[in-house]
Amino acid sequence: MVHKLQGQIFKAQGFSKLGEKYIDHFNEEMGWVEKFVERIIDLGGEIKFEGAKARPLISNPVEYIKEDLEIQKAGVDLLYKCCESLINDPTTYDIMKAYLADEEEDLYWSQGALEMIECIGQQNWLFTQV
């Protein structure tokens, strides 16, 4: 939900491209939630919803990317460990592997954005997100 809210904040600030990127990311995440829920049900598991840890919303786009990158790094590391434990369940492994690839792509985008900001400056980069 955070990505959707952040996207709406960025759009309201006039950064339409950046806002859409995070709203689209939220929608992708919901697609993954559906796939994992379906798999849990297929395996006879019980679906639970546990509230997510609260995260502050950040109005500065660059600061948000930096904070999100740290969360992405930890998440990708965790997904690698999860993949290792799923080697005997090829169907779930394939879903997790595809999810990991999607999350890595997001991580690389964040890293690339921060590298670009370093090269051309924050104001110039923000202008590209209008």
Where are the regions a protein language model picked out?
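Iron-associated oxidoreductase/ferritin-like identity signal
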Residues: 1-130
